[in-house]
């Protein structure tokens, strides 16, 4: 017997029972994005490797350790996308979407990072991102955060996420802070683990993200990033906080929040939760005003965020179990024997014409009434339509409410209106 081939570790199948809740959550997210004027952009899964090295930073964990990079048959270095912003910026430059224009874009799809798989964190994961180009004021930063807050309310998880904010300033301000932080860390190298010692010179701001409790205690005495901000960044951040206060959105200023990608400046934010065990990030983003120019375009202000859908699905299931998937089937059509199957299929097509969007399944494969009603239950149908020889002869169909058990014979010409009433 041939050996079974299984999915790659950390790359999961999502089966019909799971995809239904994904579809409902994604539909909610997309509806909110549309209400704020965002348009979808669809991007390649594979990009040229230099795109991510230039955008994310060569000395980041993503580029150094986590990217799936390979050489194609032409000898070009290609990479499965580890995040979406770089590809979105590349597409905007390539197609002339960004120069002197305001754009509000969103994308959704799989991303890839070679990490240790754990709950809610996989090597192939799904991300929804939104990016705004051409606007530089704190008002658009605030609106992006308001958009995400509206998501949480729509999904019933608003009480289980909290917002952390910071400003990491301009490139110049960050360079000054970097020097001060390195000088501090050099004086306390005995407390640093090997990872922090490596990062101290390659990307010292990442030391602020260390989970090592000894390093965290040391950082309590480290220079504060907020003390090195330029005046424009201070004003921008104060404006953002004022707008969030006016909108009633609670937040905590976390001066150790820096984000793991090099392209960020000024505003950075994360929505975090404690409802999945240890604290985890649900959604994160910030401003990246230099990235478009860095990738070959003209200087363009930009801000955006991304959200891991696996973790979001887990959170919704954990704290709002009433947010259930829509049933696969609204109506199940039961046919009494092979001689009525053609009439049943004709009626089903007619109802699909008259009731766009209805989820209607016709029984196939025969079976007595008991078996067919069991199938209707399996698919979660609310209503069964029963068509026998007598109903075919007199142009009626029996409509049975599978919740109440009530049933009535209805003329086929008027059954669509009757079904609309029952389905609400």
From Swiss-Prot:
It catalyses: tRNA(His) + L-histidine + ATP = L-histidyl-tRNA(His) + AMP + diphosphate + H(+). GO terms for molecular function: ATP binding; histidine-tRNA ligase activity. GO terms for cellular component: cytoplasm. Belongs to the class-II aminoacyl-tRNA synthetase family. It is found in: Cytoplasm. It comes from Salmonella schwarzengrund (strain CVM19633). Homodimer. This is Histidine--tRNA ligase. Its EC number is 6.1.1.21.
């Amino acid at each position: 017997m041939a050996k079974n081939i299984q999915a790659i570790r950390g790359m999961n199948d999502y089966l019909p029972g799971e995809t239904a809740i994904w579809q409902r959550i994604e539909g909610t997210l997309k509806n909110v994005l549309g209400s704020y004027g965002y348009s979808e952009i669809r991007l390649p899964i594979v990009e040229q490797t230099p795109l991510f090295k230039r955008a994310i930073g060569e000395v980041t964990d993503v580029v150094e350790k986590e990217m799936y990079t390979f050489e194609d048959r032409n000898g070009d270095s290609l990479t499965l996308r580890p995040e979406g912003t770089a590809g979105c910026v590349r597409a905007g430059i390539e197609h002339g979407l960004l120069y002197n224009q305001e754009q509000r874009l969103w994308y959704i799809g799989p991303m890839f990072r070679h990490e240790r798989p754990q709950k809610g964190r996989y090597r192939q994961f799904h991300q929804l991102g939104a990016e705004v180009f051409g606007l530089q004021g704190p008002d658009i930063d605030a609106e992006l955060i308001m958009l995400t807050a509206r998501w949480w309310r729509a999904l019933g998880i608003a009480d289980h996420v909290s917002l952390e904010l910071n400003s990491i300033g301009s490139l110049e301000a960050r360079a000054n802070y970097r020097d001060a932080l390195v000088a501090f860390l050099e004086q306390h190298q005995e407390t640093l683990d090997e990872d922090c010692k490596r990062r101290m010179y390659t990307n010292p701001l990442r030391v602020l993200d260390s989970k090592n409790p000894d390093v965290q205690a040391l950082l309590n005495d480290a220079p504060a990033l907020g003390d090195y901000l330029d005046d424009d960044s201070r004003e921008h951040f104060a404006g953002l906080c004022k707008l969030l206060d006016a909108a009633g959105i609670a937040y905590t200023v976390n001066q150790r929040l820096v984000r793991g990608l090099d392209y960020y400046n000024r505003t950075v934010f994360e929505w975090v939760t404690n409802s999945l065990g240890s604290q985890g990030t649900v959604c994160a983003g910030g401003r990246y005003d230099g990235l478009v120019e860095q990738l070959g375009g003209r200087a363009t202000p930009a801000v955006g965020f991304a959200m891991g859908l696996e973790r979001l699905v887990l959170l919704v299931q954990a704290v709002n179990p009433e947010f259930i998937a829509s049933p696969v089937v609204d109506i199940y059509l039961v046919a009494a024997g092979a001689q009525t199957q053609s009439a049943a299929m004709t009626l089903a097509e007619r109802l699909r014409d008259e009731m766009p969007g209805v989820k209607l399944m016709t029984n196939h494969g025969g079976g007595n009434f008991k078996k067919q009603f069991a199938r209707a239950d399996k698919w979660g149908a609310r209503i069964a339509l029963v068509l026998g020889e007598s109903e075919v002869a007199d142009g009626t169909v029996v409509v049975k409410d599978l919740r109440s058990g009530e049933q009535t014979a209805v003329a086929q010409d008027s059954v669509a209106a009757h079904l609309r009433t029952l389905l609400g």
